[in-house]
Amino acid sequence: VAVFSMEMSASQLALRLISSNGRVNATRLRTGQLEDEDWSRVTSAIRMLKETKIFIDDTPSLSPDVLRSKARRLKREHDLGLIVIDYLQLMAVPGNSENRATEISEISRSLKGLAKELNVPVIALSQLNRSLETRADKRPVMADLRESGAIEQDADVIMFIYRDDYYNK
């Protein structure tokens, strides 16, 4: 698994993975205030992550070409099985400043091509427009994908996370 995280550093992401897999409170893990029963879960989570082939790249403003180059190398050297990108709008297209929607379209098409070329699924996270905050029904729809209709065109599957309890407290 290759994770290209332009939002979080590799160490922040590793802490989150340990916290999640070990079912340990993230704040206690981050501050080192672990309780006795946390230690075995942290150790198990670290062991499991160590045995998992997971590569975290936290290069900021990654371009599609650089990402493609890194993914090809990982596929060749480690038989890459999944690519995760956090998140699409933080990628950059060098020299293209026409408009952001055009850039996002180019990035989206590039990721679709990469998935086909390497025969590897690509999960690309995306931000949503703030417009859904003003609607009565806060459930996200495809039109809420930020800066491009190309995302819905290029994606094989689009999934949204929605927590009713968050909006209806």
Each language-model region and where it sits:
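Conserved ATPase-coupling elements of RecA-like P-loop NTPase cores
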Residues: A92-N99
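Phosphate-binding/switch region of NTP-binding enzymes
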Residues: E103-K169
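Conserved nucleotide-binding/hydrolysis micro-motifs of P-loop NTPases
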Residues: M8-S11, S20, P60-S63, L88-M91, ...
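Glycine-rich anion/phosphate-binding loops
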Residues: D65, A101-T102
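A generic structural signal for short
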Residues: T59, N99-R100, D137
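Cytosolic-facing regulatory segments adjacent to core modules
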Residues: V1-D79, V93
